Amino acid sequence: MELTTIAEDLAFPEGPVVMADGSVIVVEIAGPRLTRVHPDGTTSVITEWDNPASAGPNGAAVGPDGHMYVCNNGGFLWSDVNGMRFPLDRASGSNQAPEYVTGSIDRVDLGTGQITTLYTECDGHRLCGPNDLVFDSTGGFWFTDLGKQRVRDLDKGAVYYARPDGSAISRCIDNIDHPNGCGLSPDGATLYVAQTTTGRVWAYDITAPGELASPRGTCIANTLGNLDSMAVEAGGAVVVAALRQGLLVVAPDQT
């Protein structure tokens, strides 16, 4: 496969969102900023977080109101090894910056660049490190919280459901290790979640907005890869980015 470079010199880009005008909006986690990549390869900054040591825009998605909703992981420690940047202090094994306070769900006005923080906690427990999100047909969204890793311990992850106006948030899946990418089946009846460290992809039956038949789910892929974000094709195939292997594709019949 021949790959074409469209834009360079981005500070750890993730969360690409294809826009109607042909541009692609990405987060630059190490920026931390939200950037538009135009079809000709030029870039323009939409907004920057004013607390770079404790902000880390991660997954992003356009909401029903046209605003961009961003998982803010609260910032990382960084290491540069052999020309590559890693969101982790390789010496200590920690990725939690000293300035870290909390993770959050942020809303960005794409016209003005204004950032509004919608959620920093759920039922009195802070969001540790939100990672990826996906909207459903009712206008609500599911999001993963991968958490933070410290020298001697790490957070247990979770999956949440929230409303885009900041009015309601609920914890739907608890104690899941490193939940990363998430997506919905074309009919909106199934939630998919990829785990980074286990290399597994899980499927959960949705019974109503923000409600699952069971928080246990069904494992539809068990790999040796370290999984990242995902996308679900119109035909139902689940495509997951694997950090070293490339792309993992789970067919609609889950083979």
What feature does the model see in each segment?
Residues 1-255:
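Sequence-structural signature of mature extracellular/luminal beta-sheet repeat domains
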